[in-house]
């Protein structure tokens, strides 16, 4: 059965190009088009597509408002097209908070030309998101006001989706099928959360979290549960363009009780602080003078993921053998699997998100299938269990 897609853009040229690229894949059928957000909401209810591609800036109703309405009326996985600017990044993060599942950069030159890589990326995202035939993961709304830097304490602070006056967001959402390289349906049953390996107090020096599709919302839910006095440093690897990571680090910092910022080369990894790897480059850890620091370096041409979870995990295995917790959250592909194997050989624990709460069960499925996962946890429990570490 083909994945049924609805294409939404106020530009007729872009609608035609996106439709053409999608329908070159035998597994995708474009069942409708819309020129603005209002039409998108109507078409989503009428056509009930498996996935929607959505522009942000449109007349009558913008893409963010349309996503919000679609999630209220006819929850459907939505792939946003985003400009590669700081403002575009913040708008895209707002769309993800509203319920969109993922985003893809919107470059006129790429879409107007016959860019094979862009076409393949678009097709893969639509197939992955549309394959679940259901609703996307719960949104993680922004707080009413930024966290006061001087008030980061053990005071109670609601996690995203649990803010005052809002009902908690259900942790489960539409699970989309992973792309071809990963076959989680054949994966052996992973250990139940309550039977997984427990971590002794003082046994760790570092937490490394890796994620891709669905990661921005997942990270907001996980990181917002960590207390201000969290005893470990956190390195976050999120597949994201370079222009997006500064805005995303700011968003996390607004939500969290610990400090979150974009990593710079040579930054010390300190307890109670999370560093987000910059997009478009590689990030790892190294030890200088007995202190763990971040190493930021250019990616080689053969490295597809920039930043790469595998590279970060491998560096943690080298400099924190047996003392780095690797966490793999929702995402396409298998990035993190090989690095998790290296971590595991040093005696380090590995956690992964479960299938039911993953937007794309690719990366977590890969580590589960490889047999290196110690604990398989629902998304909200990942943050809860991290908060218990001492």
UniProtKB/Swiss-Prot annotation:
Keywords: Chemotaxis, Cytoplasm, Hydrolase, Phosphoprotein. Residues 201-390 form the CheB-type methylesterase domain. It is an enzyme of class 3 (hydrolase). Phosphorylated by CheA. Phosphorylation of the N-terminal regulatory domain activates the methylesterase activity. The modification 4-aspartylphosphate is found at residue 55. The active site is at 212, 239, 335. It is found in: Cytoplasm. Residues 130-198 are annotated as: Disordered. GO terms for biological process: chemotaxis. Residues 136-148, 179-193 have a biased composition (Low complexity). The keyword Phosphoprotein applies. InterPro entries: CheB-like, CheB_C, CheY-like_superfamily, Sig_transdc_resp-reg_Me-estase, Sig_transdc_resp-reg_receiver. Its main location: cytoplasm. GO terms for cellular component: cytoplasm. Pfam families: CheB_methylest, Response_reg. GO terms for molecular function: phosphorelay response regulator activity; protein-glutamate methylesterase activity; protein-glutamine glutaminase activity. It catalyses: [protein]-L-glutamate 5-O-methyl ester + H2O = L-glutamyl-[protein] + methanol + H(+); L-glutaminyl-[protein] + H2O = L-glutamyl-[protein] + NH4(+). Residues 4-121 form the Response regulatory domain. The keyword Protease does not apply. Its EC number is 3.1.1.61, 3.5.1.44. NCBIfam families: PRK00742.1. PANTHER family: PROTEIN-GLUTAMATE METHYLESTERASE/PROTEIN-GLUTAMINE GLUTAMINASE, PROTEIN-GLUTAMATE METHYLESTERASE_PROTEIN-GLUTAMINE GLUTAMINASE 1. Belongs to the CheB family. Involved in chemotaxis. Part of a chemotaxis signal transduction system that modulates chemotaxis in response to various stimuli. Catalyzes the demethylation of specific methylglutamate residues introduced into the chemoreceptors (methyl-accepting chemotaxis proteins or MCP) by CheR. Also mediates the irreversible deamidation of specific glutamine residues to glutamic acid. Contains a C-terminal catalytic domain, and an N-terminal region which modulates catalytic activity. This is Protein-glutamate methylesterase/protein-glutamine glutaminase. It comes from Alkalilimnicola ehrlichii (strain ATCC BAA-1101 / DSM 17681 / MLHE-1). The gene is cheB.
């Amino acid at each position: 059965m083909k994945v049924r897609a609805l294409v939404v853009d106020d530009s007729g040229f872009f609608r035609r190009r996106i439709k053409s690229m999608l329908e070159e894949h035998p597994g995708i059928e474009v069942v409708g088009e819309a020129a603005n957000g209002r039409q998108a909401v109507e078409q989503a209810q009428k056509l009930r597509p498996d996935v929607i591609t959505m522009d942000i800036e449109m007349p009558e109703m913008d893409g963010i408002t349309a996503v919000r309405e679609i999630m209220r009326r006819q929850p459907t996985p939505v792939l946003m097209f985003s400009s590669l600017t700081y403002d575009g990044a913040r708008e895209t993060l707002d769309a993800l908070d509203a319920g969109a599942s993922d985003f893809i950069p919107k470059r006129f030159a790429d879409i107007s030309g016959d860019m094979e890589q862009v076409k393949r990326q678009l097709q893969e995202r639509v197939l992955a998101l549309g394959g679940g035939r259901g609703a996307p993961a719960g949104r993680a709304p922004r707080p009413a006001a930024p966290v006061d830097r001087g008030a980061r304490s053990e005071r109670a602070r609601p996690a995203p989706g649990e803010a005052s006056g809002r009902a908690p967001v259900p942790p489960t959402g539409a699970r989309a099928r992973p792309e071809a390289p990963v076959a989680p349906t054949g994966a052996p049953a992973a250990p139940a959360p309550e039977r997984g390996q427990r971590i002794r107090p003082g046994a760790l020096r570092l937490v490394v979290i890796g994620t891709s599709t669905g990661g921005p919302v997942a990270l907001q839910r996980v990181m917002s549960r960590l207390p201000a006095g969290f005893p470990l440093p956190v390195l976050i690897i999120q597949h994201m363009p370079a222009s997006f990571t500064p805005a995303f680090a700011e968003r996390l910092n607004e939500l969290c009780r610990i400090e979150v910022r974009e990593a710079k080369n040579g930054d010390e990894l300190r307890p109670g602080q999370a560093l987000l790897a910059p997009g478009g480059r590689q990030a790892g850890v190294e030890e200088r003078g007995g202190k763990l620091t971040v190493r930021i370096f250019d990616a080689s041409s053969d490295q597809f993921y920039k930043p790469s979870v595998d590279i970060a995990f491998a560096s943690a295995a080298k400099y924190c053998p047996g003392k780095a917790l690797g966490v793999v959250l929702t995402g396409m592909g298998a990035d993190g699997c090989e690095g998790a194997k290296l971590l595991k050989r040093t005696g380090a624990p590995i956690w992964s998100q479960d299938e039911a709460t993953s937007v794309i069960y690719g990366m977590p499925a890969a580590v589960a299938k490889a047999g290196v996962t110690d604990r398989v946890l629902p998304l909200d429990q990942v943050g809860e269990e991290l908060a218990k570490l001492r």
